[in-house]
Design a protein with these regions (language model features):
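Positively charged, amphipathic and often flexible ligand-engagement surfaces
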Residues: 1-302
Length: 302
């Protein structure tokens, strides 16, 4: 019930206004968000790479309904990618892109998002790195996978995210478990109806393991996005005889575990930055009770 309430709050303009106006919120947000500027993001990226971890950067923003904002997001990614190359970080730092941030919600959104994603992929290719398409709520899944297919004709290294809580995802994993494919498997963090998503955690966990087996048995590059100790152990066992896979974890979550895993496995940190942090932040609170406890404890003790 608490998770449902928090996910509802993630889409509430009134809740957003209240949280963003609270002076004590921003210092806590910085546990999960690198900062507001590209310089903030570059500094944290360099530190993470120096610790033996790779990075995927997310310029925060979603559900854009203004063409100028979508264009600004593309420009921000192009600037970021140029700077990653200039600072020698591109070999270990890619970007993650939400299609709703680059025009998917606009009229003729599939075309607009594809054109803008192409521009970002071209900038990534010039920088010597890659792009992963983030997955959002289930209404965008088909459109996102359609854009993925189009992009991979010119940029075969483009990755995608699949969410284990959706009932369709095991088949999507089968469809994408081919040579050259990069798939980030996560559990999912949006409020979804039971008609399309498993409502119980135990069902989501079982789905995650089924999907993980499909990806590990396939010819692609699995990207195992989880903080769950049980899923980490299962992934390590399933992947022990193959080198071409990685763990992915969120910035600010289980840092010590990230460092431990990085001693024996490839680990990539999902690193968001920018001013549009509200939706991302609230979904992180909803995912793990420990995150919410940290937030409330920080507010009380400041």
């Amino acid at each position: 019930m608490l998770r449902t309430a928090l996910l509802a709050a993630a889409g509430s303009p009134a809740c957003r206004s209240l949280v963003e106006r609270t002076p004590l919120t921003r210092p806590v947000v910085h546990r999960f968000v690198a900062g507001s500027t590209v310089d903030d993001a570059l500094a944290v990226t360099a530190n993470l790479i120096g610790s033996g971890r790779a990075v995927t950067l997310d310029h925060l923003g979603e559900d854009t309904t203004d063409p100028s904002m979508a264009a600004a997001t593309v420009k921000a990614y192009a600037e970021l990618l140029t700077l990653l190359a200039d600072h020698g970080l591109a070999p270990d730092a890619e970007v993650s892109v939400k299609l709703s941030a680059v025009g998917l919600r606009l009229p003729d959104g599939d075309r607009v998002a594809l054109d803008n994603a192409r521009r970002i992929c071209a900038a990534a290719a010039a920088a010597g790195t890659t792009v992963t398409l983030d997955m959002e709520d289930h209404t965008t899944t088909d459109a996102t996978l359609g854009v993925l297919r189009e992009l991979r004709a010119d940029f075969p290294w483009v990755g995608a995210v699949l969410q284990a809580y959706l009932r369709r995802t095991e088949q999507d994993c089968r469809d994408l478990a081919y040579a050259g494919s990069r798939v980030r498997l996560c559990k999912g963090a949006y409020a979804e109806p039971a008609s399309v998503a498993y409502p119980d955690k135990s069902e989501v966990d079982r789905s995650y393991v089924r999907c993980l087996r499909v990806l590990m048995d396939g010819a692609g590059h699995p990207m195992v996005a989880t903080h769950d100790p049980r899923m980490i152990a299962i992934a390590a066992e399933l992947g022990k005889d193959r080198p071409d896979w990685e763990f992915q974890m969120l910035y600010g979550v289980r840092d010590a575990e990230q460092r431990r895993l990085a001693r024996d496995h490839a680990v990539r940190v999902y690193l968001p930055y920018g001013d549009e942090w509200y939706g991302y932040f609230v979904r992180r609170l909803a995912e793990r009770p420990a995150n919410l406890a940290f937030f409330l404890r920080a507010l009380v003790t400041r």
